[in-house]
Amino acid sequence: ALHVHMKIILLPGLDGTGILFEKLLEEIPSVFDVEVVSYDSIKAVSYSSQAIEIAERFKHEDIFIVGESYSGRVVYELCQILGGHVKGVVFLASFISRPSAMSRVASIMPLGLLKPNRLSRFMLYLFGFNMAGGPEVVAPVFQSLQKTDKRKLKLRLSNIAHLAKPTEKIDCPVTYIRPSTDLLVGINSVKYLASMCSNFSRAKVNGGHFIAQSNPVVCAKVICNAVNM
């Protein structure tokens, strides 16, 4: 059955703007009611309070949530708050516990490293895109990072570094889009997320960590299939 009347909520990755969903949105059929939540529109800074603030917006309707990277824990918290109103979840290369040892380092690095230069472009192309798609794929990421609230960005990095493992289960159906090469989210983090889900399936999609940007066509298909389950 086509659940076209159910709202699909997209929660962005670390940049927090939602700008990087542009290609993905082009691939999701217009019959779906899709809303992108930008973290710049949210006052809250901790994972749990971000979820509480977002939950207020959607508490009277049934929703389907797509959470990219950083947003995994917000999605998890939303499932706990909204319960049966969340009809399903797709995680895009996401995590609900600390994704890797590198995430601790990320929170103390100067934000100047996120400005585009030869080194930062190369690092993002390597770690975010697995050196595929041509070096120009990193440009929109840097553009969105320049637009985001830098103080909030720093706090989001800190949130990732200090993530404790949650213990409550997610009851709704969960689909996890796992990039073929994710250099930022370790397999143990994915396994832990899977263990917290009552109904979990994994979809392996060709690409790097920025999977919605490097393979929007397949990601959109997985999302639409999950919504229609």
What are these regions (language model features)?
Residues H5-A44:
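Conserved HGGG/HGGXW glycine-rich cap/lid loop of the alpha/beta-hydrolase fold
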